[in-house]
Amino acid sequence: GTLLTAITEGLSAFESFTPLAVGIAWTLVGALLAGYLLLYRRGFPPFIPIGSADIRSFMRSADGLLISALVVMSCVIGLIAVIAPPTNEDSMSYHMARVRHWIQQQSVAHYPTHITRQLFSNPWAEFTIAHLFLLTGTDRLANCVQWFSMVGSLAAVSLIASRLGADKRGEVLAAVVAGTIPMGILQASSTQNDYTAAFWLACFCYVLLRIRDAPEVEGPPWAWISCLGLSVGLAIL
């Protein structure tokens, strides 16, 4: 999220927010990450095989049924997000409208408009949509920003429950309760940004609990402190 914001603002400063520039930027990011993994990683964690008997046993349990229902629901919402283009009023009036303006002027700078929320509303979700639009040449993936935020939020909620002392069933129930919020289901296949903000706030809460739980053993390392600040900053953005 921070890299995406930096790329967006950096390219916009030179009015170079174009498909070519964004593509080059993400290619460089991918190359740097691949180089880091090759040079500094000692090795990846060993793969732990899961037997078919274990899977069948889990699927027959109450937790397995709840997780299965949540996965099916998420897949259906994801399919709708990909198939159905953005059509709701918010998408047309400012979410997608500001994205098209930014792409047209090759910058996220302010522009003349009588719909002022295109200028002052939190822009991070639309930054992401703009990147997807520039990289693919279509708005087909615009709704996926909310959908991926929903999936990430459910994972974060489960981890938060674990940090608060819940057992495996408690983690599953936390994810199910969060995933079945009616408004969340409706918005997860749109370009609205509620789930995007919720995801970064959930990340902030998890990191905060992570630092709280192990201050003496590990100390709050700079990486976790940085994640704490960045997550709340991205939630506001």
Each PLM stretch: what is its role?
Residues G1-I55:
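Membrane-embedded, hydrophobic transmembrane alpha-helices
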Residues T2, G30-L39, L141-G165, C203:
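Transmembrane-helix motifs of polytopic, lipid-linked glycan transferases
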Residues A84-R98, Q104-T128, T136-R140:
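Extracytoplasmic catalytic/substrate-binding loops of multi-pass membrane glycan-assembly enzymes
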Residues I115, L186-T196:
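Short acidic/glycine- and proline-prone juxtamembrane loop motifs at membrane-interface regions
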Residues R140-L141, V157-P182, A198-F199, E218-G219:
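Transmembrane-helix signature of polytopic, membrane-embedded enzymes
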Residues G165, F204-W224:
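Membrane-interface transmembrane helices that cradle and orient dolichyl/undecaprenyl
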Residues A174-G179, Y206, V232, I236:
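Short helix- or helix-capping micro-motifs
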Residues W222-L237:
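Membrane-interface alpha helices of multi-pass inner-membrane proteins
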